[in-house]
């Protein structure tokens, strides 16, 4: 059976509950969030590949599940954030270009057990993966008929990566194709720094974002 988005979301929910019930003894004492994330993501990919026809990503494809255009992110409840590859400044406004599946865990260790309690599992459609504050500001400006110079001014004010040509091209695209409201917090760095606190707490109130909470 071919893996689809609907199946992915249901499997992510079931996997979260299964993962929370297991003893992950190999992670006892591990504090490196990247190691925990890799562990969870590989388990989930294996869980899916046993049941469905799918493509597993590589460093070349850049995302974990290219056949459903989805990247998997695993992050601690203490500070739900991760990094995403920077491709262009327009990702901050129009989205990353792929869906995100986010597992948020609370890790608890004893001498003999490690529990990964999945507190939140959130699926975010690609067009909701832009930055919250800049898309809100742009949508507000467009609602009162802002012009190209107004938009370029906002891009400067918000320190969007790029030069005058980038800003001019972005402003033209924003006027021609107003962005959807995004729900991530995206900070500029060599890679995008993405924070998930807002999106994991939407409680299924926004189209394009599916939330499970335990």
What are these regions (language model features)?
Residues 1-66, 74-214:
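Nucleic-acid endonuclease domains
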Residues 70:
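Acidic/His-rich structured neighborhood in mature extracellular/periplasmic domains
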């Amino acid at each position: 059976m071919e893996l689809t988005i609907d199946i992915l979301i249901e499997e992510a929910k079931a996997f979260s509950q299964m993962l929370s019930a297991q003893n992950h003894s190999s992670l006892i004492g591990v504090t490196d969030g990247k190691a925990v994330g890799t562990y969870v993501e590989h388990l989930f990919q294996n869980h899916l590949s046993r049941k469905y026809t799918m493509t597993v990503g590589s460093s070349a494809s850049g995302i974990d599940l290219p056949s459903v255009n989805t990247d998997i992110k695993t992050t601690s409840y203490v500070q739900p954030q991760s990094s995403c590859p920077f491709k262009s400044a327009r990702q901050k406004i129009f989205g990353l270009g792929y869906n995100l599946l986010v597992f948020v865990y609370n890790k608890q260790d004893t001498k003999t057990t490690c529990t990964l309690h999945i507190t939140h599992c959130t699926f975010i459609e690609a067009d909701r993966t832009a930055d919250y504050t800049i898309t809100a500001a742009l949508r507000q400006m467009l609602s009162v008929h802002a012009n190209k110079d107004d938009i370029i001014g906002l891009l400067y004010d918000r320190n969007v990566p790029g030069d005058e040509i980038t800003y001019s091209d972005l402003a033209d695209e924003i006027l021609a194709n107003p962005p959807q409201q995004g729900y991530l917090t995206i900070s500029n760095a060599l890679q995008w720094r993405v924070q998930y606190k807002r999106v994991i707490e939407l409680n299924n109130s926004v189209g394009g974002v599916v939330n499970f909470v335990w």
